[in-house]
Amino acid sequence: MKFIDEARIEVIAGDGGDGSASMRREKFVPFGGPDGGDGGRGGSVYVIADRNINTLIDYRYAKKHMARNGENGRGSDCYGKGGDDITLRMPVGTVINDMDTGELIADLTEHDQKVLVAKGGAGGLGNLHFKSSTNRAPRQKTDGKPGERRMLKLELKVLADVGLLGMPNAGKSTFISSVSNAKPKIADYPFTTLAPNLGVVRVGPGKSFVIADIPGLIEGAAEGAGLGHQFLRHLQRTGLLLHLVDLAPFDERVDPVAEARAIVGELRKYDESLYEKPRWLVLNKLDMVPEDERRARVADFIERFGWTGPVFEISALTGQGCESLVYAIHDYLVEHSDAHRAELAEDLASDVRFRDAPGAGGEPHERDAGAH
């Protein structure tokens, strides 16, 4: 099973051109002196964030990206042409690390954000620069500097407002397809979703939010079981988590409470800050529960789970309860938007060292997650 959110690429900046050791030779100018030009600079490699790109799939196949070398200098004070820069377009939310040093180079959080990832080499100096009062005909010149060469690890973190959390087959894909424009693959078996699906939920004119259908979790995900960390990392930038629970599993031996506790346990083992994020409980598949049993089954689940936060009862298949949930999410996001942006800014300031671009344990007891 492939999870298209990681790629490894090599970026190679261009070498600088060599300087020229040349003498001016013209009729009637017997001692023309040096006229060797400088070499051109090597091309650099930049990355730029593009909100119209959703995956890193292109970089799983195109793994080497090279900028052009600078041209050598020539006589008659001719400077070499600089190598052309290249720009790699990547999704907003991509994190770029140097694989050799572990340095965090960039976290692309804004559309059109531009970051230098490999700097081209400087051009060499021609002998024109070495002329002095004691050396009128210098033969010295310098070679161009090599461009930077790096192995980069690209990692995509979904920049969504809301993340869907739950066991495989909890109905997350059905829910996101019913409330948004996303069209994820849906089937009656676990692990239908192998890559995150993003959907834009439109509440009204100018009112919308992004929801991420993250692949289902299994117990042991924090240690890498199933698709492991690849699931959990996508939830780190969301402002709100929806914990979807299948209230009517096909297998009667499955206990929804035990599954819900397992999910929360994995969340806490992976990242305490992720566990502390605002989280709402969404009880799904009510259409599969007889009407005369619904109230009792919901009450029993909440009591056994020890949940005191917001609860929503829905059927993603029929749409029952989805509209009220969507409006509640939108109202919450509007109310807490400033706090979420501040959290992202603080996170960015703590761990990102941008390079300048020219111009540019156990079974947890639940708490009231909606009070954040």
From Swiss-Prot:
Binding site for Mg(2+): 173, 193
Coiled coil stretches, renumbered: none
Keywords from the UniProt entry: Cytoplasm, GTP-binding, Hydrolase, Magnesium, Metal-binding, Nucleotide-binding
Major subcellular site: cytoplasm
Residue ranges of every copy of the Obg domain listed in the record: 1-159
UniProt keyword Magnesium, yes or no: yes
GO molecular function annotations of the record: GTP binding; GTPase activity; magnesium ion binding
Taxonomic superkingdom: Bacteria
SUPFAM superfamilies assigned to the protein according to its UniProt record, in alphabetical order: Obg GTP-binding protein N-terminal domain, P-loop containing nucleoside triphosphate hydrolases
Cofactor dependency: Mg(2+)
InterPro entries attached to this UniProt entry: G_OBG, GTP-bd, GTP-bd_Obg/CgtA, GTP1-OBG_CS, GTP1_OBG_dom, GTP1_OBG_dom_sf, OBG_GTPase, P-loop_NTPase
Record's subcellular location: Cytoplasm
Gene3D superfamilies, A to Z: GTP1/OBG domain, P-loop containing nucleotide triphosphate hydrolases
GO cellular component: cytoplasm
Residues that, per the record, bind GTP: 166-173, 191-195, 213-216, 284-287, 315-317
Assembly description: Monomer.
Family membership: Belongs to the TRAFAC class OBG-HflX-like GTPase superfamily. OBG GTPase family.
PANTHER family: DEVELOPMENTALLY REGULATED GTP-BINDING PROTEIN-RELATED, MITOCHONDRIAL RIBOSOME-ASSOCIATED GTPASE 2
Task of the protein: An essential GTPase which binds GTP, GDP and possibly (p)ppGpp with moderate affinity, with high nucleotide exchange rates and a fairly low GTP hydrolysis rate. Plays a role in control of the cell cycle, stress response, ribosome biogenesis and in those bacteria that undergo differentiation, in morphogenesis control.
Protein name: GTPase Obg
Organism the protein comes from: Burkholderia pseudomallei (strain 668)
